UniProtKB/Swiss-Prot annotation:
NCBIfam families named among the record's database cross-references: rpmJ_bact (TIGR01022)
Domain of life: Bacteria
HAMAP family, sorted: Ribosomal_bL36
GO biological process, one term: translation
UniProt name for this protein: Large ribosomal subunit protein bL36
Length: 37
């Protein structure tokens, strides 16, 4: 899980979602998981 100020999809399988007011990227590649901090 990477915590960064701006989250962007890295590959075509990355999805940008909102969970509890936080913007997150989920992907089948675990390295692409991101959360907005």
């Amino acid at each position: 899980m990477k915590v960064r100020p701006s989250v962007k999809p890295i590959c075509e399988k990355c999805k940008v979602i909102r969970r509890r007011g936080k913007v997150m990227v989920i992907c089948e590649n675990p390295k692409h998981k991101q959360r907005q901090g």
